[in-house]
Amino acid sequence: MKNSTVSSLLCLLAAAIWGFAFTAQKAAIAVPPFMLTAVRGWIAGLFLIFVIMLFDKLRGGKRKLFSKKGLGVTRIEWIAGVLCGLVLTCATTFQQFGIVETDAGKTAFITALYVVIVPIYGIFLGKKSPLHVWISVGIAVVGFYFLCLTSEFTLAPSDLLVLICALIFALHITVIDRFADIV
């Protein structure tokens, strides 16, 4: 199979998993939001330890993950990891609080707005985006208006929580972008 086909199939798989996650989150509303975020974080952390050890093994075992000197992580890697983790925790917690009172589809749409919020953040960082990006931002704002705003031009509190989640997820992408070349 060609690399482009594999890449496309992997993107489709990731999108499907992401979409099903909202249904699972909605089903888990009986679990307190902070508890759910903590459990998700622990599961992800344990999985990442496994992935790190696997990649280390595939690369010849050059990186010492656990040694007497520490974890083999630089100061900047610690800062980047902690900052990304804190921002991600805030975003998922707001999302979980928001999904309690709104449906999964609406939560997914509002959360996905982070994609068009990132270029808006980019303006403040001196980054320019092409015209088609701004057209997409406009279309997304119109979609948000029709989906979430009432005739009195108000937003449900749960939708506001999910919108805050999208703003924080966009910040997460911005933080990752900041550290990607360094780490």
What are these regions (language model features)?
Residues G19, W42-L46, I117, V141, ...:
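Small-residue-rich packing faces within the transmembrane alpha-helices of Major Facilitator Superfamily
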Residues A28, L36, R40, G98, ...:
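Hydrophobic/aromatic residues within transmembrane alpha-helices
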Residues L48, S129-L149, L161, C165-F169:
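Hydrophobic transmembrane alpha-helices of multi-pass small-molecule transport proteins
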Residues Q96-T102, K127, C148-P157:
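Membrane-interface helix caps and helix-loop-helix hairpins in membrane proteins
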Residues M1-M35, V39, G85-L86, C90, ...:
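Glycine-/small-residue-enriched transmembrane alpha-helix faces in small-molecule transporters
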